[in-house]
Structure formats: structure tokens, C-alpha cells
Amino acid sequence: MALNRLRIGTRASQLALWQANWVKSELEKRYPGMEVELVKIKTIGDKILDVPLAQVGGKGLFVKEIEEAMLRGEIDIAVHSMKDVPTEFPEGLGLVCITEREDPRDAFISNGVTFANLPQGAKIGTSALRRQAQLLKVRPDLEMVIIRGNVETRIRKLTEDKLDAVILAAAGLKRLGFTDVVTEYLPVDLSLPAIGQGALGLECRLDDQAVRETIDFFNHPDTAHAVRAERALLWRCEGGCQVPIAAHGQVSGDSLTLTGFIASVDGTRSVKESISGPVTDCEKLGIALAEKLLADGGHEILAEVYQREVSREKEIPV
């Protein structure tokens, strides 16, 4: 039975509101007469804008306060960018839908110069350590500048901070209609995307069957299998969204191919591997690929990045 009213928790950034409004619109189309309310919530990641996310530390910088509101019963569902969602949830909450993925690639924005034609020592603005590591691996001469802020702010920094280029997720630019500023889209073999990049996740209270049934139509099976594989890899590597780990899954028929990457922040040491198997084994494939990456040098790289040991073995939760 469809609900009469649904409250959506969301961050207040332009992109987060676009995403939440898209979910609202789809709900209203499917359930005419349903009252859908957006509840804006400020997260710690929104409040701390002058420090790189990797230095803020911790997991769930963009979801914790939203989850707390859900546990208090103030909202019914939350809409997240999947790349911001930690691999573990507070008791009673969970990810119940993963939407069809928008373009998962990274977008390169410059004054018309492609990545291949960047001058020596060019300054590149990015918010992600995984982008930094991958691009320094092929161009160690580049100077990486960590930038924060919403999509428009980051685009402006190209001019304001006299940068040669900035790199953002293509999905956000496409959703907000900023594709005209993109110089090129970086191929995934150059810049492997963040875990879950381009997909949205819908979280709710696991015991709220009415809500679960109401939002179930958002789930896109191929995207869900790919993203679950990526997240299983991240979980096994004990990574948050601010470590130099990347993974991208692609589904073809009943088969899933997953590529994973672990690197030191400066890109001097890295390991990259792929694995294929049935989509029904998506999480097992993610964990198997993580084990392979860790065994081939990823363990030592991450121990240095985290400045602590990474588990040699990790119990899979039931």
C-alpha cells in the first residue's frame, strides 16, 4: 500500500537538492496525490569547507546527521550520492535501492587544453585522493591542488585560483546542466571512478516495510550489482570515501567485470586488477578482488596511507 506522505532527508547543496527533487518528482509521478516533503540537513562535510576531506577524517562525513534524523523519526528516506555512503550503517538503517547510474567518468575542465596536452607542472584542482594518485602515476610533474565546495564553486576555482584544470564527477555536471564547460571526459582506464560514482542510493529504516515497498521501483538491478561489488571491495580494504581506492563494475548480461585500484597518495606505488564472474556473486567478487589487490602490494600501501595495519583477514558479516 502506497503511503500518503513521505519525508526525504537531503543535504542542502545544489546537487543534493537536484537529486532529492528528482526522487520527489518520480514518486509524485508514480503515486499521484502523495505529499512529498524535502527536509534539508547540514552535515559535518558541509560545515568544514576549509580543510581537505582526507584530513577531516572519519567515515560518513556527508550522511551521519541525515541518518541521525532518520533514527529520530524526522525523515522517512534519505537520498545519497553513492560515492559518499559508508560501507556500514547504523543499526536499523540500510540501503534499499540503488538507482540507474549516470555517467561514471571524471570530467576534465580546462581552458580548452586536453589532459594529454597539459604543460609541464600544470596545476590541477581536485577533491579526491584517488584522482590525484591516478593522474600523478602517469604525470608525476603535475601539481595537485585540493579544492572543496559545491559544483559551481569548483568550476569557478579554475579562474579564481589560476588553475590549469579542475576535475569533477561527470554525473553531477550532467545533472546540473554544466556539460558545456567540460573539455573532455577522462576514460576509466586513466581515471577509474570512485566507488558508486554516478549512482544514487536510497536509505531507510529497515523495519519500515511500507516505505520499502513504496520506493522499491527506484532500484536498478545492473547498477545495484555493480555498485555492491565496488562497495564490497571498499569494505574489505577498510576504506572510506577519502582514500586512494577506486573501483568500477560493469554488467553485461549475467556477467560482472570489476576493476579495482589502490595507490599511494603520490601515485608512485599502485596496484590494479580485474575480476569477472556471475552478477549474483557481486559481493563475493568484490571481496575476492580486494584480497588480490591487498596480496599484490595493496596491503602495504594502505597500511602507510592509514598509518595503521589493515586486517589480513576480515569476517564477512552475515
UniProtKB/Swiss-Prot annotation:
Its EC number is 2.5.1.61. GO terms for biological process: heme biosynthetic process; protoporphyrinogen IX biosynthetic process. Pathway: Porphyrin-containing compound metabolism; protoporphyrin-IX biosynthesis; coproporphyrinogen-III from 5-aminolevulinate: step 2/4. The modification S-(dipyrrolylmethanemethyl)cysteine is found at residue 241. One of its GO terms (cellular component) is cytoplasm. Keywords: Porphyrin biosynthesis, Transferase. Binds 1 dipyrromethane group covalently. CDD domains: PBP2_EcHMBS_like. Its cofactor is dipyrromethane. InterPro entries: HemC, Porphobilin_deaminase_cofac_BS, Porphobilin_deaminase_N, Porphobilinogen_deaminase_C, Porphobilinogen_deaminase_C_sf. It catalyses: 4 porphobilinogen + H2O = hydroxymethylbilane + 4 NH4(+). Signal peptide: none annotated. PROSITE patterns: PORPHOBILINOGEN_DEAM. SUPFAM superfamilies: Periplasmic binding protein-like II (SSF53850), Porphobilinogen deaminase (hydroxymethylbilane synthase), C-terminal domain (SSF54782). One of its GO terms (molecular function) is hydroxymethylbilane synthase activity. Monomer. Tetrapolymerization of the monopyrrole PBG into the hydroxymethylbilane pre-uroporphyrinogen in several discrete steps. PANTHER family: PORPHOBILINOGEN DEAMINASE. Belongs to the HMBS family. HAMAP family: Porphobil_deam. The porphobilinogen subunits are added to the dipyrromethane group. This is Porphobilinogen deaminase. The gene is hemC.
